[in-house]
Amino acid sequence: MNTFQLDYRHIQTPKKGFSALFRDYTADAPERETLIAECFHLDYRKSADYYRQLGLLSARTFQRESLVNMLLRQNSRFGGGERQQQAIEKLRSPRCMAVVTGQQLGLFTGTLYTIYKALTAIIVAEQQKSLFPDYDFVPIFWLEGEDHDYDESASTTIFAENQLKHFTHQPYRRLPDQTVANSSFSDDIRTIIDEMVALLPNTPHRTMVAEMLHECYYPGCTFEISFASTMLRLFRNYPLILLSPQESDFKKLAMPIFFKEIESAPAVSYQVIAQSTRLESLGYSAQTKPRAVNFFYVNQHGQRQKVEQPSSDTFQIVPEKQRLSRHQMLELCQDHPERFSPNVVLRPIVQDYVLPTFATIVGPGEINYMAQYRPIYEHFGITMPFLVPRGSFTLVEPKISRVMDKLIHVTGQPGFSRKNIYNAVFSNLQQVKKNAIGEAEHPQLATMFEQAKDEMRQALERLNHTLSTIDPTLEPLLAASIVQSAKLVETIEQKTWKASRRKHEELLEQIQKAETALFPEGVPQERVVNIFYFIAKYGMGILDDLSNLLKGYASDAHIIAELQG
């Protein structure tokens, strides 16, 4: 498998690339040092911080017995085996720490980056064990099912005939704002699986995919059970532990965080706002807009409702308009901790209070909002864990590799390599298209147009001194003529490209095929496509291949992986 690493700073997909903050966080630049110092507690590139984190976590007290018993029960219910059990049992020891990641529940596991997160957590845990053999590190995947954004969770996408095919499960007996985890599938799920499988590559692996999906997704089953059982089947050879945070047993462990949020609200929101201002002063955008109260209330029907604070000592559950005093809210949390659900601000705090989190595996968006949370961690007396970027891949099939070869032939200079063409495609695809058409027609066409514009501008500028001595009022006319001459050349250039495009439809179609494969819907492939397309075509071994790649590469660069077969 040919692989190439691309710097995030040089990637700009057609619609949306990676944020400036994430590019700086993964770069080797002075901006990174400032960002780390202002926004985080630990730097995953500094070895001294690793010893510091080991000491900090070893000194903290966790409810390990309760945590282990809960995880054993949950993973057994999800279909976990001996690998999960052995990994969970290690957490009884104060010398065992967690490498945590997680993702919102998605149909058939959702997009590729869900899989990449899990793989990265597994590999980072292995690497820490090799560095610190006296400690154990276990990978934990947080099942984010308390969200109520059903539409996002209930859809998935595969490639079919060089196009994208979308599949969506419609809500079934679902109340407004009901949590995704407890939403069930209707009889339609069987049809969706059959329709999707029919479009998957017709290989011996396709039957296995169909069987797995039908066994995990069936009428009456909940999103959480289906997602969790699928993940454990995919990672059956790995010690990945799943965690459901919606259970009462987990909420009891997190209760002190909810208590402090109730007692101190809206203090956390003010701290996020202050940190956001600091972040913006560094030139970055703030992702998260905090609320006065940073948790939701889940009613007896499983509906996730906002909690507002109309006055300093009053909380109100929306839309029911139920009002409670601060004391009443504390009593409610004491009696029914399962009714409390952290929002995006409080969620990582809950995670790192309950779990001995050594490191969290995060995506680009998560890095952005975690940069706003340093003062919140300090408010709750917790050190932020290492924030390690998840593995990031673009999987390139042989037919797309052949398009890359053609682009090298058409647009490349002597010595132009595969990595050169990937850098060009990922930094400015539209320019690659333009160059490909122009170079196919005339190798120096783009250069000739640029030269024409420069020569016309220089010729007119040479007149400036003479014209200004004759009549200074001619200078604005000359300046306008320089602009018009450039526009004239650009008009001719555009018409030339259009004429050339008509002559090179086949090449354009191949480039379009590559664009759909590399940047579906104009964004990175990992944000759109489902893993089962690739499993059906290349088998379950693709997970081992990606795992091996992560062992050999740092996760702070994007990896292009050319698949074989």
Curated annotation (Swiss-Prot):
Residues 439-519 form a coiled coil. Pfam families: CC_BshC, Rossmann-like_BshC. One of its GO terms (molecular function) is ligase activity. Transmembrane segments: none annotated. It is an enzyme of class 6 (ligase). InterPro entries: Bacillithiol_biosynth_BshC, CC_BshC, Rossmann-like_BshC. Its EC number is 6.-.-.-. Keywords: Coiled coil, Ligase. Belongs to the BshC family. This is Putative cysteine ligase BshC. It comes from Chlorobium chlorochromatii (strain CaD3). The gene is bshC.
